[in-house]
Amino acid sequence: MKAIKTSLAALFLTIWVNSLVFAQTASTRTPDVPFVPTRPAVVEGMLELAKVTKNDVLYDLGCGDGRIVITAAQKYGATGTGIDIDPQRIKEATKNAEEAKVTDKVNFKQADLFETDFSKATVVTLYLLPAINLKLKPILMKQLKPGTRIVSHAFDMGDWKPEKTVEVDGTTIYFWTIPAKK
């Protein structure tokens, strides 16, 4: 009888531990895109193409180390939010903002960009993969106000033709404006 109780206890313990592991795995996602830093010249090109000003609220989706949001705050006085699913990137971005002394203008959130409200943005920057851009497009169209500027490093949005493209440091940068709602 003692052996059965011990076996049952071990079985329940195993089930409980596995359920904790599953719950943790189910509630966290790995990044859809590997972290590849945007070169400084491309960051500058993206912000110039978007015509960022001190009145802008910039959201960088897949912000990595925060360099785009931080540069927008330093150079143009914009406020901004960086969104990234990777907690290591958020820690790094927050540290970089502290070192740049722009924590009064920027913040970083660990979140799934497909489940995040970025409707306050006047500028959105992206360095994601083509499939992610395509998946994100209807969310951008739904959430963002007409006139919001979108700038993407290296990848377009399929059949949504950019208003402008520029080459910076061997990289194409794409620019769109959210159209009036129909």
Task: Enumerate the predicted regions with their spans.
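Conserved class I S-adenosyl-L-methionine
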Residues: N55-G64
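A short SAM/SAH-binding and catalytic strip from SAM-dependent methyltransferases
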Residues: S119-K135
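Class I SAM-dependent transferase core
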Residues: V21-K54
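Glycine-rich SAM-binding Motif I of class I
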Residues: G66-I70
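Conserved SAM-binding motif I beta-strand of class I
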Residues: T79-D84
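C-terminal substrate-binding/active-site "lid" region of AdoMet-derived donor-dependent transferases
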Residues: A131-K182
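Bacterial N-terminal signal peptides
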Residues: S7-L20
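S-adenosyl-L-methionine
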Residues: P87-K120
